């Protein structure tokens, strides 16, 4: 078991305060959502979901050359800096085997979402190729529209519909396909009621109107599943055994530290050879992902050599 100290990744492009003037020049629509803090400093109205969406649009255009990005109302609008952190820490993990970050890695994004955020960042930063799985037809259509609207992305990102709501990797990872890593931002609530309660807390903290959080607060399949995050990840762990020779590293975000012990036990039960925890922090928010592999050091090196 190994762990890193929390902190924004040094390669993350969002280390400093947003250059709002530059972002507004890239995406003029952001201008109408600027406000002043009590200290008189210019900021974005984070209580307004449309403002957060405009900020995301500007960040993706300014830093990642995504000139066309949009999501339908009701789907998650992810914070770009935190999503970028996952990608950079994953890059470090992949680089540990050979001493350098791979530039032609194949990555599977489980639940790519309407926003397609991880493939957009990973393809730009490292030239990785992504397969994104998605159970929602509406989310998949949105992600596909983003890919088609931006030159070159169709060569880097492909999408696959998960038609079996009880499966995670099955039906997505095909025979004779190999992936350097999988990543996932799993649903963390165990019921729609719990998801609504979480959204309500977020709304109150931001001072939003009751309807605002519904605009980009997330769909049910993005926020909740039966049994919650632990049950979902346990299923992922169990299913990963089937693809133990086709995937170098399986990874997933874990929203709460108290969820880790049962997941570690599940990983021991399936015979994971190595388990890694990566701690991350964005502002006041603490997060982490766990990674596991069924290959020892020599097998991982051979996997990479053979794949290349």
From Swiss-Prot:
Keyword Cytoplasm appears in the UniProt entry: yes
Catalyzed chemical reaction(s): adenosine(1618) in 23S rRNA + S-adenosyl-L-methionine = N(6)-methyladenosine(1618) in 23S rRNA + S-adenosyl-L-homocysteine + H(+)
Coiled-coil region(s): none
The protein's Enzyme Commission number: 2.1.1.181
Alphabetized InterPro entries for the sequence: METTL16/RlmF, rRNA_lsu_MeTfrase_F, SAM-dependent_MTases_sf
Keywords: Cytoplasm, Methyltransferase, rRNA processing, S-adenosyl-L-methionine, Transferase
A Gene Ontology cellular-component term: cytoplasm
MF term (GO), any: 23S rRNA (adenine(1618)-N(6))-methyltransferase activity
Classification via CDD domains: AdoMet_MTases
Ribosomal protein listed as a keyword: no
Top-level taxon of origin: Bacteria
A Pfam family the protein falls into: Methyltransf_10
Subcellular location: Cytoplasm
One GO BP annotation of this record: rRNA base methylation
Record's function text: Specifically methylates the adenine in position 1618 of 23S rRNA.
PANTHER family: RNA N6-ADENOSINE-METHYLTRANSFERASE METTL16, SAM-DEPENDENT METHYLTRANSFERASE
Homology family: Belongs to the methyltransferase superfamily. METTL16/RlmF family.
NCBIfam families to which the protein is assigned, alphabetical: PRK11727.1
Protein name stated in the entry: Ribosomal RNA large subunit methyltransferase F
Organism: Salmonella arizonae (strain ATCC BAA-731 / CDC346-86 / RSK2980)
Lineage of the organism: Bacteria, Pseudomonadati, Pseudomonadota, Gammaproteobacteria, Enterobacterales
Gene: rlmF
